[in-house]
Amino acid sequence: MEHGYLFNSNSFSHDLPFLWEAGGRVLVELPRQPFGDGRTYQHRANDAGNPHDTLLIWKAMFDEFHEESRVSPTYCPFQFHPYISGRPGRAKTLRSIIQHMKKADGVWFATGSEVARWCLDEVFKAEHAKAAPRKVAAS
């Protein structure tokens, strides 16, 4: 918090972003989820894995989140690593899931910073205003 970070992604404890407050400063927690290439390829950077099965898993995860979003907001943080999905045999799978996601209505592709800023400005606006640090004039 003291070094200007906007968000953290260490928690597995929630499904949706939430606020951490300490010492009058606020940090958005963007909870991690087991979605992405590390889980489906089991962090095997050089093993072949099975890109076809991985794509089916990713589509099923995304489709469920998208269906749930019709009832209430969802947060689906897929994590892709260049050393895992950037391999020639896996890049096509990555392109395929992105194309699948782009076909769905109401999907926002955003960085962690963009999501955290949106949470502060829109979702947690009232909470953030209460916890915002006060500016003090220097003498």
Task: Give, region by region, the residue ranges found by the protein language model.
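C-terminal domain-boundary segment and adjacent tail
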Residues: L55-S139
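Active-site-adjacent pocket scaffolds in enzyme catalytic domains
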Residues: M1-S72, A126-H128, S139
